[in-house]
Amino acid sequence: MVYETSYESGRKPFKPDLHRGKWEKPTDYIYACFGLALKLDSFVVSYWFFFDMGLFGILPYYIYMALYLVPILVIHSFMGQFSSSGFISAFRVSPFFKGMGYVSLALSLATLLYYSLFAFVPLIFIMHSLRPTLPWSCEGISSWSNESTICNMTNTQVHTLLDSRNKWETFEMTIVRAPSVIFFKKYYEVTSQPVDESYILSWHIVGFSFAIWALITFIFYNFSETAKFGKLVRYMVVSTLVLLVVCFIRFLFLPGAWDGLTHFVKPRADSMVNGTRAMLIIVLQAFGSGWGTVIALSSFNNFKTNVMKYNWIIAFGQTLVYILFGMVTYMLDNYFKTIEPKDFSSYVLKNWVSYLSGASALSTLEWPNMWTIIYFTMMLMASLIVMITQLFTVFTSLFDEFEVLRMYKKKVIYGVLGLLSVFSVLLCSNHGVRHLTALSADSLISHSVMHLLLLLAVLWVYGRERFQRDIEFMLGQPFASWKVFILRFIAPLFLLNSLLISIIVSSFEHLLFSMAIYISLFVLLPVLCIPGYGVYIMCKNTGGFCNRFRRACRPNDWYPVEMEDRQKYEEVVGNADITHQLYEVTEEVN
């Protein structure tokens, strides 16, 4: 394969952003990737479809981690670190596939809309925890609600209710709600009765949503520089994990907590079976909601950073986060099981146990206001870490790809945040929540397809030998051929399996809606944009079809940004593979 510069291909030359900066500490890359494990919608999806897995359900994760998570992390980090550019410009390695970068941009922005839900829900509980009496506690709910909850449903009352409701029925079941679920539900209620009230906005939620985006804007106003941002994320991740451990220790004293932990660590064959499916989904969460997040984060590494070692640390660290969150969720879930009566058919409805129902369990602790604030502050920080990290990679990729935007960085950042805050209002209705949260499941399909295309672009189109040579040059150490074999032949098999599981999960999300419309909007259209952009690149080339296709697939301005590394790379590659001296492309920089 022949290398080309932009001048020879007729395209605008790539000019690196010399002011993009580097991490203050090399480990900031690790902390930022740890933050991706706090993507809490993955816990919601896996718990809903594959609940009751326990610790042994996570064991298949280690197999997947070795066979395709870490290898694909290496591909992502190689593209970002070698090119020192975001997830759009990094596809100079094969411009035909550059549409993947734009699809990643669209996925990042779209998923940020629904992910704000995971931020403003904790904020609601934090603000109301400042009251002297928690409104969802057994004492507080009696002042504003007469509904039957776990607080006022005695055995006698339940038997009476069963007799009155099931007089002519043979099946007897009573559904009892947690007070915190009823409390949150009232924020979506409206006083009028329109034809379809699910489309009516909850103005309480709108206010909290704008508060979240205002907080994010404040963060980027003060921490938009790479070194400052990395330091902020480092402290936020450490603080979040410390609060998570504190909550874990305190929850050990909840009724039924030890039973829940025992059930969590108990070996069960069905856990392994469920884990083989669920972990295929969880593994994909390591790359963030927008797929290209790791590419952009690794672009701030020094050129010789040993990402092989870092990626193993990231994979094991993310697993630890999953286990901690899993144990906390099990303890909260088992608390409600202990208060369910044993002598009749009744069930405590645990909506979104980590968020909504969990607040009722916290209200039973000593100093409930303090523990509620601590727990939901941890959840809020986890959501903010995911959101600001993803936004940071979006802005970085935009500025790397579009040179004209670099002059207006602040305006672009505030403009994008303003638009996202406006469109996130769609989440402030029942209709919006039901439809936009389906993006989480739909994005799993897109991620699996794009991982497969990435392997095709780097290991088959760019070539196995060239990839192996480049990563050895970057790391300064050998990269074994068996690792390349796993990437080319083993990892795609697991990705195809994860694609199948993702399609099944997505179909469940769309059972009540028009599946054809949503699949076309969030899955098919983004995937079709990738070859569409490739055709666009071919049209800009000259010659016959085959010649146009070959030139569209050739690496274009693919070299290290730093002059010293670039000249060494030219010597390694040799003039036989390069049609133009690499350093001439950015001669004006020096």
Question: Where on the chain are the PLM-derived regions?
Answer:
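Membrane-embedded translocation segments of transport machinery
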Residues: 2-25, 30, 226-390, 396-425, ...
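Terminal cytosolic tails of multi-pass membrane transporters
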Residues: 2-3, 17, 460-480, 513, ...
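Flexible loop linkers connecting adjacent transmembrane helices
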Residues: 5-13, 45-59, 74-102, 122-142, ...
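Hydrophobic, membrane-embedded alpha-helices of multi-pass small-molecule transporters
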Residues: 31-41, 111, 116, 164-189, ...
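Juxtamembrane transmembrane-helix boundary signature
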Residues: 31-34, 38, 60-95, 111, ...
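Hydrophobic alpha-helical segments and their helix-loop junctions in multi-pass secondary transporters
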Residues: 72, 115-133, 241-263, 331-333, ...
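Extracellular/lumenal N-termini and interhelical loops of multi-pass eukaryotic membrane proteins
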Residues: 116-197, 257-260, 265-269, 339-363, ...
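C-terminal membrane-solvent junction of multi-pass transporters and transport-like membrane proteins
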Residues: 402-417, 442-503, 508-520
